[in-house]
Amino acid sequence: MSTSPAVETQAADSSAASTPADRTVARLRAAVEQGDHAAIVALFRDDIVFHSPVKFRPFEGLATVGALFAVLMRTFEDFRYVGDLTGDLEGDADSRVLVFRARVGDKQIHGVDMLQFDDEGRIATFTVMIRPQSAATALSEAVFAGLVADGVVPAAQSGGQQ
């Protein structure tokens, strides 16, 4: 099946007009679909800040956020991005919102990943919002257990709002 020159030109124009953030989003989606932890972490800045839906204080730094993502990848079942929104957020950083669906045990999760990028397209801030609350609770408990098992946090630390 061939495409018309107009369609090919439009595709080339949209590809040429893509921003570093657009390219990072495409790489993130591909890495998530492939379950490629290293490729996901390679998209983060060294000083990345990750805001959890269940923890008050953010996770900070590449090593910590990378370890968290290893646990998240084992915890989420049937994770898939189902939408990609663009718009403006306060501040100058380029940003995107990715809508996702997943499961933790028998809990269905609806969520969004809010990403802010640096000028080179690396992810500087990653904020997750999920619903319903029962799914957030199940996710919190499973992730905390995974972080303890991986030695990222001590078992005595509370899994609650810190």
Region locations from a protein language model:
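C-terminal and inter-domain tail/linker signature
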Residues: 2-162
